[in-house]
Amino acid sequence: MELITQKIRQCIEKVKDMSQVGFDRDYVIKDNKPDVSKVVCQNGQVKLDEIKASGENIWLSGSIEFEVLYTREEVFEGDEPEENIGGNRVEHIKDAIPFQEKLVLQGVCEKDTVRVYTGLDELTVGVINSRKLSVRGIISVELYGEREENLEVAQRIDDKDVEQLMGQMKVLKLDSAVRDIVRIKNVVTLPKTKPNICKLISSLVDMRNLEYTYERDHITLTGECHACIVYLSEEQEICCFEVQEGVSNEIRCEGDNAGNIAWLRTQPAMHQVEAENDYDGELRQLSIEAALAVDGKVWSEETVEVLNDMYSVSCPVKPVFENMKVCSLLMKNDTKCRILEQLYRENSKKRILRICGTKTQAAIAQIKNADTGIIVSGVLQVNCVNIVEDDGCPIEMHTDSVPFEQFVEIPGMDANTCCEVNVQVDQVQVNLLDNSEYEIKGVVSINAIALQQDEVSVITSVEQEKTSSDTEEEAALVGYIVQKDDKMWDIAKRYRTTVENIMEINALTSDSVKTDDRLIIARM
């Protein structure tokens, strides 16, 4: 009696957690840089190099990559003109501070896979003394513990003497786990209205309006690479240049069904901006390189035939059931959240003359369950580079955090629903209303996927059942009154006959019965 089964590859989420990690480091300014007087601008990102899991202990190793613009304490005699920047005394530091952090993710074991996503929620660079800076911030960490396993589903028994109750089950089959680095490179030329580049001072690079589509054997990732470049001209003036270039990349993955379901998460891995000569030999081109760490999955939604129950009228056998988790898709929902906020800089003594560019990121603060979905609360962080009214240092950066809240509809959620949410910036526009008041308009994309992980009883094997003496003495013909919740299959199995036999004896045209129906049953 052979049990015919089908193996279905699944990824079961076991546990998830969101936490924040604070860091506080001292940074000693290198000898080739002059003394610091005041920090003007700062920005940074988290670079995750290694994830080590040992049971419930998760070790994260990486670095905080940061950029700082600061004013010199004084202008040194003998400096080259380009180092004095026309008396503006602006200097640039770009470096990284390594970190290692231990987190605990309860419920995972050695065989599980741990996914980690990080973001830099806050960065503050202060002056300790003329040769030392304090770098402080908060890193947000998303942790997911999951396990790949094969669900073995019994589909039939290769024996004509066995009665089989068939059914259908919707499952989400894992076709491919995607993990890759997407590299982006653009070369842009300065507008004719902009002067030539003498020296790059700072660069803010981020990705916006990222979208992906699954097309049989690959995922197409499209979006916009946004860069704000601050440079020194040949006339020793500080200039700003903002550019936005479209990008498109293909990520290879398994699967050949155009209707497959894809889920993708991206994280910035690096960026680099270099000045290059154009065809005329002038320094008017910018090479912008960026890399995104891509992590995701591709599923196919299938309806499979399953063997729900079985028995034999000729020999005493019984199925052995085991509870297993079955993953299915509840909903995938993409929502846009529009943001409009007016802000006023009360404590600033410098008048804003022009907003040069921005760097943005969106982060989740909290996810709450609602009646028919979830409420996602988060923060849109906008770093603005401004030209201000200050002959000594005409450039500054300020960071604004604009809260947002959006309801995402996911009907049918319960305790067995696993929901993952990703937020990213689509558009941001900062308009200067007057010299101290400005307006932030933005669109944040909120992507949510909800998977149902229900525990289902499935047949894993068939074993021989002992024959009792009472069975041999039972009457060959019995009368039966249908009880509440009785089904024809259960009645036939109890009296070791077949559904077809009961229907034939009682002249029934359907196998449906209702309470208090009277049946004649002939044992086989």
Describe the predicted segments one by one:
Residues 1-473:
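Interfacial loop/beta elements and low-complexity acidic/Ser/Thr-rich segments
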